[in-house]
Amino acid sequence: MSLNLDEKKAVVAEVSAQVAKAQAIIIAEYRGLGVGHMTQLRAKARQSGIYFRVLKNSLARRAVSDTPFSGLSEHMVGPLAYGIGSDPVAAAKVLHEFSKGNDKLVIKAGAMANHVISSSEIASLASLPSREELLAKLLGTMQAPVANFVRTLNEVPARFVRGLAAVRDQKESA
């Protein structure tokens, strides 16, 4: 299905808006991937907050021109799907996990902040913990000293109460 000029401009504007908010873009070749598998991939991407779309490469080049992701233009060859996300790890995880289970999806390249990354670097990125997991670990690390301090403060009166209880028990038994 060919798009007229106004539709092409609308697609470029929509994708450009997503690219402006993005931290990472990952491109993958989907040659031979069935509709059912592509629908599953889209659903997983949507759940992870990833904008996932199949685009004409010429429109994608226009959308990323004059952005930190313009280096991806040289990799935009063949039937490609674009995963655009504000969390680089989430985008890498979704596409990498799906490509492990389906050999028809081949990750070609990606980009983060003026840096084009290879498919092996995307695999490494996918093995990192997600943003939420890192924030949870950070919060736990920050709360640990405070929690230990509170336990220490609570131990002083608790020890006093246990001492009084021991004295009471000793006097009652005597």
Curated annotation (Swiss-Prot):
One GO BP: translation
Using the record for this protein, list the coiled-coil segments as residue ranges, or answer none. Answer: none
* Parts of the chain that traverse the membrane: none
Q: Which residues form the signal peptide?
A: none
The family database entries (Gene3D superfamilies) matched by this protein are listed as:
3.30.70.1730, 6.10.250.290
Which GO terms of the molecular function aspect are on file?
A: large ribosomal subunit rRNA binding
The record's listing under InterPro entries reads: Ribosomal_uL10, Ribosomal_uL10-like_sf, Ribosomal_uL10_bac, Ribosomal_uL10_bac_type
What are the record's GO terms for cellular component? Answer: ribonucleoprotein complex; ribosome
What highest taxon heads this organism's lineage?
Bacteria
Q: Which UniProt keywords apply?
A: Ribonucleoprotein, Ribosomal protein, RNA-binding, rRNA-binding
Known partners and oligomeric status: Part of the ribosomal stalk of the 50S ribosomal subunit. The N-terminus interacts with L11 and the large rRNA to form the base of the stalk. The C-terminus forms an elongated spine to which L12 dimers bind in a sequential fashion forming a multimeric L10(L12)X complex.
Annotated function: Forms part of the ribosomal stalk, playing a central role in the interaction of the ribosome with GTP-bound translation factors.
Q: Which family does it belong to?
A: Belongs to the universal ribosomal protein uL10 family.
Give the NCBIfam families listed for this entry: PRK00099.1-1
Protein name as catalogued: Large ribosomal subunit protein uL10
**Which species does the entry assign this protein to?**
Nitrosospira multiformis (strain ATCC 25196 / NCIMB 11849 / C 71)
